[in-house]
């Protein structure tokens, strides 16, 4: 009787499939990685230095550190992107819109600044994160869509504005300070030190969603226009706080 022949799969074929998949993925990612360009440079900084950045699109993170140096690191999506920071005795200015007449894709920034810096950041789209800055002013402006996150802030003037996106504001309010936070569509969350004294005007015309939480027992407030607007004072009212949200919530949290 003739014995049946059993066919075995090719001994190397099973192990080759994961290798081929990995090679295919590498081929797909290689052009993207090759197209990117990285910029990194340090600039000596004096006290009360100013950082100004005007970007088109991309994520921007600014973090304060204990060094007399501004460190700018940027990853550019396109190798044709240009960036020529201007360094003066007053600070560093980066204008991506001026240096690139056409859209060159995302440029993502990570920047380190001294604690006492003034920070002025503007982008057409993309998120902005600013942490632990204690200078005279902090400004974050997103023309279209992008979240804004300001944490550990201790500045006399703070302005944050976007069209679509959330705003997180975690700060100590200073006597005589001015704080303005506005969004058209998104949620605004304010975590403020409980010892801060401030005058408040909060407006949510579409949602009427304004939640004072613990501050409701710490100050005096009046509601207007069917709770679309809240005006009041906490403590000595030493700072001015104004926030408007067209189509989202405004939530206050003492910390």
Regions inferred by a protein language model and the residue ranges of each:
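Intrinsically disordered, low-complexity terminal regions
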Residues: 1-255
């Amino acid at each position: 009787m003739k014995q049946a022949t059993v066919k075995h799969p090719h001994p190397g074929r099973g192990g080759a499939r994961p290798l081929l998949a990995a090679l295919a993925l590498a081929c797909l990612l290689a052009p993207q990685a090759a197209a990117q360009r990285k910029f990194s440079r340090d600039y000596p900084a004096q006290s009360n230095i100013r950082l100004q950045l005007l970007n088109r699109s991309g994520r921007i993170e600014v973090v304060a550190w204990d060094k007399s140096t501004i460190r700018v690191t940027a990853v550019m999506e396109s190798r044709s992107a240009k960036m020529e920071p201007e360094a003066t005795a007053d600070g560093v200015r980066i204008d991506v819109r001026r240096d690139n007449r056409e859209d060159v894709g995302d440029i993502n920034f990570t920047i380190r600044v001294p604690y006492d810096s003034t920070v002025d950041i503007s982008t057409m789209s993309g998120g902005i994160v600013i942490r632990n800055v204690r200078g005279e002013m902090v400004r974050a402006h997103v023309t279209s869509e992008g979240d804004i996150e300001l944490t550990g802030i201790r500045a006399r003037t703070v302005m944050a504005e976007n069209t679509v996106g959330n705003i997180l504001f975690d700060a100590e309010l200073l006597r005589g300070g001015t704080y303005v936070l506005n969004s058209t569509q998104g949620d605004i969350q304010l975590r403020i030190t409980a010892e801060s004294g401030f005058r408040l005007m909060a407006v949510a015309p579409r949602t009427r969603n304004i939640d004072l939480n613990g501050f409701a027992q710490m100050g005096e407030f009046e509601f207007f226009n069917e709770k679309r607007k809240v005006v009041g004072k906490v403590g000595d009212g030493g700072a001015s706080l104004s926030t408007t949200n067209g189509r989202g919530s405004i939530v206050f949290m003492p910390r």
